[in-house]
């Protein structure tokens, strides 16, 4: 496994290559992430953006870090959280002075398949969400993830017929209202995620069949719940694919945004020069809007994960 010094050398090598190919001006336009790498490696961050590492990305791909390694890296880079971690592993986070910025909802299998849009799953989703809320309240962690679910009548069977969006969103409002009061009482926020349905190349790069794929419609639906503890997980990668105009939409929906995710597009890879999203500008907009939630780094590593994370954390540290 590559240590921090090796990662730093790799990044400096990339800087030299980029300068040769693109020139110093182009490198600066990309956010000038590389020259600041040493500060990120030492955990010296500005702190205007509270950053988090999404555990599954680095546990399932690349070097397949365990929770201990991921927590060590998060701490070394100045991140405050490792998220979507099972409560059984929260002790490791606390040992390193970290939080779980957003907790899993406890649904078995792919948790985004069976959600609030389908009444046949309401009992299980609500019960498991309440259990996750309890765990977060006990640990002092801020939020729990939620999903609309797939649009099929039977989430496992695309031939079972579709739930129309209006009906599905009405079901979401009804289901979320059943748990909103509990979340308010416990002081934990439910953050429902918008996902893209366009990318069908990889099971975690896109989610064809997911009902909540229009960020504007999802935001409007969540406002109908009318609870300060029911908000949206604004995933920049998914929004860019489905709707675009990310910076304007941040301002449009800041009232309902409770959590933010990143990844490079196309490909859900690193936040580097091979993708199209201008993360420094987006982070500056979040600061301008006084966003005080967390930003989770949720890219799937295609090269050395420490190098990619160091670059991403630095890029977003505006």
Show which residues each predicted segment covers:
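Active-site mouth loops of central-metabolism enzymes
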Residues: 54-64, 112-124
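Short, hydrophobic beta-strand segments that form beta-sheet elements in well-ordered domains
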Residues: 79-85
